[in-house]
Amino acid sequence: SPDYGAEMISAMKSVRSLSIVTDPDNLFSNATGILANTRGRGIAWERPISIEFIDPDHPSDSFQSGAGLRMHGNGSRGNPKNSLRLLFRADYGAKKLEYPLFGENWVTQKFNTIVLRAQAANSWTSSRAEDRASTTFLQDTFAKDTQGAMGHPTAGSTFVHLFLNGTYWGLYNPTERPDGSFGEDHFGGDDTDYDAVNRRFSVEVLSGTKTHWDEMITHSNTLLDSQVEYEQLDDYIDVDNLIDYMLVHQFMQTRDGPDDHGHNNMRLVRRNNPSGPWRAYAWDMEYSMIDTTGTRDYTYPFPIYSSSRSGNRDITDSIASVYLRLKDNNPEFQLRYADRAYRHLYHGGALSEQGAAARFESRVHEIESAVVAESARWGDQRR
């Protein structure tokens, strides 16, 4: 576009670039290419690559490393712009990526896995016109930032321009993946010292086992009858983390998380050695800041967390179901929830107008130039 052509050079320099180089067949072969077989999962569909981070502001910080590459995501695999996952193992060179990907002050500079989020569900490549019309690229990052501002551990998030074998592939959102290695990098110990689960319509084990998870679900079913049992809940789950996690979803009106869409995209990690409580992490929240009509009226309230749209799905093992049982029946939990909500919604708290707006604007400034390049790559995809 002549309106933005003059901005392209500055747009390409406004964030770091990540270059991925590999045998073209690893990407595009009908038989073995991961971009030609986007439904492929697991190590059978992992391909060796070379990556290079390029920092236009600090060229001396640029570096190269070996890694593995997989597809990432679920529904977005049908989009032309796909999410990807970088895996670092000794097989490829270094066991971990050692680089200040999320800034010098981030809790860790070592990473086993990095997800390259295409944010396809809320972008110009989406098949839904309302998604394309409301593209921001920021909902999921804002959710993670908000969870951190509320005082909880969260997954790091940043932005890069991605190149695949020299071809510009668009603006991507690298983020940490909450699992056992994430626990090791953030809290110490070894990755085997952690259990991690993801609920994508049912509970999937990412690391360790879900034995303690099942015990927690069973324990929560007794909370209505016994104050003693409620007081023991802290042994199973970080209650303040649970409350604030739900507050983030309620504040942002999530449509693909612990809501009536199917109790989806819930990531939790706990330390098993020594034993600790489960903590929930904001994850894949791009379907948020919307109302039930999909018109992006950010102030329109709608009833989330009901089971009405879940059909015959069993949602009793959902963390949102634990929350519902507590919210509806336990006075002490209700008071605790009210205290947390007041803390975050008023007096400059993380969910106050001034706090939330400042945090969102900070991310807007980070990518407002970079999206010019994204629009050149993908802006006319659905026209």
Model regions: which residues?
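Conserved ATP-binding subdomain of kinase catalytic cores across diverse folds
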Residues: 20, 38-206
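Middle-to-C-terminal accessory/interaction subdomains
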Residues: 7-44, 49-50, 75, 79, ...
